[in-house]
Amino acid sequence: MAWAETRSEHFSARHEERESRQAAEVLEMLEQAREELSAPIGTPGEEVAVVIHGAAAGLALAQPAFPVAYAVSAPAGRRYLAGWPGAREIHLLSPAVLARRASGVPGSLEMLLLAPVALYVQLLCGMRNPALPPPARPGSLRVAFRNAWLVAGIGQWLSGQTVHARPAIARRLREGGRPAFPPAPSDALLLGGSVLDLLASENGREAAVALALEPPAPTPRETVARAFPGRPATEVEGAWRSHLARLAGS
């Protein structure tokens, strides 16, 4: 297998030689995301490396947390685990692999192809929020697992994946049990963005971004309660379940 490198102004990508065109498209998408996210979150001070893998096995070898996250995720959301962010690099599956992973439901392919941006958002939030990875710091992985809905959710929401997740959310609600609030780690990939979407619709985009940039509270429910000041947790949960039902029914 021959590897090649493609560069843009702020990113570099290592990929199989045959993926050069797709790699250039990924970097173009990331450059646009960098510009759009510079105001609300900021930008890395250094170039971000992107490693594009042609198979999940290669990604798992490079990022051992990837297969663990896959095993934890609910079946409806596993196909959308498309990569893993580091402090200054993003590992992701190639666009061709992501296209093959897409299901037949509307929005599945679109959600998968936005995965590079979602991972970049997670990288940015880890840069700004020392309590969460990336990079992995003492205690941060434990906090991230407990708050996986927030880590995955901010990436899903800011990348634009949430609007495309609606059919997958509907499947999750049909086939799985009643989801926890906030979503459990198994549901983070699919349902995490819905919490941020609700918060933005009620308190504005700035409130949703701020939630991801502040150290989480001791428990996930306390973190959510802090984002909706003055409202009982049961009321916020009810609003979220109604919002989730609307997303699933759209």
Question: Where do the language-model regions lie?
Answer:
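Zinc-dependent metallopeptidase catalytic helix centered on the HExxH motif
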Residues: 73-167
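Acidic/histidine-rich, surface-exposed loop or edge segments in extracytoplasmic proteins
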Residues: 4-22, 95-101
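Zn2+-dependent metallopeptidase catalytic core
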Residues: 18-72, 106, 113, 120, ...
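Sec/Tat-exported extracytoplasmic proteins
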Residues: 34-41, 119-120, 124-132, 158-163, ...
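Soluble non-cytosolic domains of exported or imported proteins
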Residues: 17-31, 106-116, 145, 149, ...
